[in-house]
Amino acid sequence: MTILAEIVKYKQSLLQNGYYQDKLNTLKSVKIQNKKSFINAIEKERKLAIIAEIKSKSPTVNDLPERDLSQQISDYEKYGANAVSILTDEKYFGGSFERLQALTTKTTLPVLCKDFIIDPLQIDVAKQAGASMILLIVNILSDKQLKDLYNYAISQNLEVLVEVHDRHELERVYKVNAKLIGVNNRDLKRFVTNVEHTNTILENKKPNHYYISESGIHDASDVRKILHSGIDGLLIGEALMRCDNLSEFLPQLKMQKVKS
C-alpha cells in the first residue's frame, strides 16, 4: 500500500467514526469576508504568485524547525506571499483544523486548507475553520467525486486548487474546467520529488487555466528550471519553514512570469 493510499484509508475511517462531524459541531465559525482572492492575485501579478505553507512534518520529513506560526504567517505576507497553505491532517502532517482556525485570522491573504478531501463534510469543516481555498487531489478521486466535490466547493464560495501528478490526471481536470491547477512534483509511489516534473506535465497544457508548481522547490535555481513551462505560481513549504531569512529568500522566488 502506498503512503497516499494509507492516508486515504485513514480519512475514510475518520469519516466513519464521526471525526469531521464532531469538528463541525465544536469549531466556532470563522468569518473571512476580508480574504483576498488568490485567482485575482495571479491575474494582477506579473511575477510568480507564491502559496507559502505552514507545516510541522510529513511522511518523509520529521525534523522541521519549530516556529512561532503567527510570526511565520506575518512574515509570509510581509515578504510577498500571495496565499498561505495550512496542513490540517494531524496524524501524518502534524496539523489541525484548530491551527487553521487560529492562524487564518492573522492574515488577509487567502488561506488554503491542505488535506486529503474525499467527502463534502471535509469541505464544510475547512470552511467553518476559516479556509478560503481547498485542495482536491485528482489521484484519490473518481471523475464523479472530482466533479461533485469541485462544484460543491465552488458553491460554498471557496477557491479550489486541483492537484495533478501526471498528464492523464491533467486531462481529467480539464473536464471539470478547474481554473487553478497544481502540478505536484512528488512521485506518489516513492514519495521522492523532481521539480522538472512540472516541465513534462505542462508541455501541452491548455490556455485559460492557472498553473502552480508544488513540492521539491528548495531555492531560486529550482524555480529557474521550471520558469519556462509557463507556470503562474509556486507552492512552497519545507524550504520556507527551514529558512531563517525570509526577507531575502521569499522575494528571490518571485520571478517574472514567462508565458509559453
UniProtKB/Swiss-Prot annotation:
Molecular function terms, GO-annotated: indole-3-glycerol-phosphate synthase activity; phosphoribosylanthranilate isomerase activity
Pathway connected to this protein: Amino-acid biosynthesis; L-tryptophan biosynthesis; L-tryptophan from chorismate: step 4/5
Record-given protein name: Indole-3-glycerol phosphate synthase
Superkingdom classification of source: Bacteria
Catalytic activity: 1-(2-carboxyphenylamino)-1-deoxy-D-ribulose 5-phosphate + H(+) = (1S,2R)-1-C-(indol-3-yl)glycerol 3-phosphate + CO2 + H2O
EC number assigned by the record: 4.1.1.48
Keywords in alphabetical order: Amino-acid biosynthesis, Aromatic amino acid biosynthesis, Decarboxylase, Lyase, Tryptophan biosynthesis
Family of this protein: Belongs to the TrpC family.
Lineage, uppermost ranks: Bacteria, Bacillati, Bacillota, Bacilli, Bacillales
Keyword GTP-binding: no
GO biological-process terms attached to the record: L-tryptophan biosynthetic process
Organism: Staphylococcus aureus (strain bovine RF122 / ET3-1)
EC class name: lyase
